[in-house]
Amino acid sequence: MAETNHSKRISELRSLLNKANHAYYILDSPLIEDAVFDRLYRELIELEKQYPSLVTPDSPSQRLGNKPATKFESIKHRIPLQSLDNAFNFDELNYWHSRMQKHLKSHSAMVCELKIDGNALALSYVNGVLTRGATRGDGAEGEEITANVKTIVSIPLSLHLQNPPAWVEIRGEAFIPNKVFISLNKERLKEEKQLFANPRNACSGTLRQLDSRIVASRHLDFFAYTIHLPDDWIPGETDPKKPKGQWEALLWLKAAGFRVNPNAKLISQPDQVEKFCIDWEKRRHQLPYTTDGIVIKIDDFKLQKTLGITQKAPRWAIALKYPAEEAPTQLNKLIFQTGRTGTVTPVAEFNPIPLGGTLVSKATLHNANRLSELDIHEGDTIVIRKAGEIIPEVIRVIKELRPNNAKKLVLPEKCPECNSKLLKETGEAATKCLNNDCPAILRGVLRHWVSKGAMNIDGFGTKLVEQLVKRKIIKSIAGIYELKEKNLENLERMGTKSAEKLLIEINNSKKQPWHKQLYGLGILHIGEANAKAIAEVFPSISLLADAAIASPESISNIYGIGSEITESLHKWFNCSINQNLIKELKDLGIALERVNEEGAIDNILMQEKLQFSGKTFVITGTMPSLSRANLEELIEREGGKVNSSVSSKTNYLVAGEKPGNKLKKAKELGIKVINEQELMTLISN
């Protein structure tokens, strides 16, 4: 009886949350408040944990996978995904249209759609439920990425139809919105990782992530544009009728719960097609996503069938491609910049050129490998492309215009800032300065610590950082908290009042959350998202340091944290300079651990947010990396209670080496026995 009641409640929650998602992401008309959604979603999760047999594939809880995939399976497309023929000007477009008219012998309406610069996906729905998502691949075969597809909230997990087809395939374009792309690259820039060249590459790389949590964090979007319905499908009373053309197909997709690009247009006159294309080429930079052309399709499905397909493309459609955003300019000079992790990056400076509605005068070459590939010389004429209409990049050199006796430009052997010898590790693209006293590295470290994503110290700008480093007033981030008015008053743009205000901001920054403090330390490969994930599992820097030094694998159990990050943490915490920095920061009042609003260690978090609430643990034996005190702290901060003896009320026995009689008693009572690593996995999950 209880399960029946819970089944009804789960069904109600599932239906309401799916409707709320559709209203928020597709209709842009929120149905319920975020806080209400969160509470209902949490209730659904808890009920599904209690009754796993009641979980359905279309439950909102299924958007995020339980564990990363090990690899993607290659699958054969039921219907091949063909590419489109391209037209690069209106003469070619008109030639295509005149050929169509000859075959059709009568005028036909056309549908014009914006060509989204993303990645094509094929989505299979069986009896209305999403069962498979796949990449285009070579058109005949793609990769099955269903777990990643489910994280895209604009893709419904079930069709909004009364009588869904036994099988239907939906096709469309996954893409990264421009704001998300810019934010993602800013994060990578802070971590000194190679930037994504454009949103399409970022989307492609995201879809191929084995961990769906990473995919979810990048907020991909999706526009549907094609359906493959079975001939025998009969719509329900409230369902849209079976479409007879592309325009009706878009309406069908919208009714079935998909996001359809709102700028598509049904056009009856050929001259209107050209007008549509010209209009959108001018307006495309105003869109929140990138487009690289216009797709024109004959509307009528019967006429499409008459026209047929070639070996690689349908005859009834064509893509008019926008001209590339490229321009030549002369290289003025190549400068080399040392970043906060010591990486030296070549940056091309050139005569300003207009691209994508902005003036561009610089382009980063990322690393020595790219510099070598381009073979840049002094005074070269270089071609700049605003890749993805956002990031300027040098794409080639016009060698025919190279000045006589021009000198080849190469990465320097010494740091441009401190003159220390540069080193390049085997297999790495980056060349680095390893001098801990390098002023450029210190400036970068300070800017990172005071940034909005870290300690958020308002008024601590770049000019101030430069002055403090140049005058040797500060030698580490700890020095920020030792500043006095007398250190600041005589600096540029700094009077007594400004100094007082800044010192208040510095003191207030000590209250920043633990995950922001961790991010601010600037550990290689630790971005904002990774710092937050790590801080949720390790509530203090002492616990994190113990694990990083003695048991890095316990950190790799956290979703999204791979060997690159664990190695970086291991190296950072083993460095005596960093160990001294931690001590200095703690002495100066930065807790480097999770605290509540009153400044106490946060043991009073809401119980429903702590996964060990109501659970009792007993610890026995010697652990491989963490002390008993560390383990107790971890368990208690997750809401659990630690007892000294095993009883029938014990939920878990955490056993290390030489566990003694407690292990025997736990087995007799049927109590779950776990080791240290399994405890860390429980916490990370």
UniProtKB/Swiss-Prot annotation:
InterPro entries: BRCT_dom (IPR001357), BRCT_dom_sf (IPR036420), DisA/LigA_HHH (IPR041663), DNA_ligase (IPR001679), DNAligase_adenylation (IPR013839), DNAligase_N (IPR013840), Hlx-hairpin-Hlx_DNA-bd_motif (IPR003583), NA-bd_OB-fold (IPR012340)
GO cellular component, one term: cytosol
Required cofactor names: Mg(2+); Mn(2+)
Gene Ontology MF annotations: DNA binding; DNA ligase (NAD+) activity; metal ion binding
Binding, NAD(+): 34-38, 83-84, 113, 136, 173, 297, 321
Record keywords: DNA damage, DNA repair, DNA replication, Ligase, Magnesium, Manganese, Metal-binding, NAD, Zinc
Domain BRCT per the UniProt entry, residue ranges: 607-685
Name recorded for this polypeptide: DNA ligase
Organism encoding this protein: Prochlorococcus marinus (strain SARG / CCMP1375 / SS120)
Originating gene: ligA
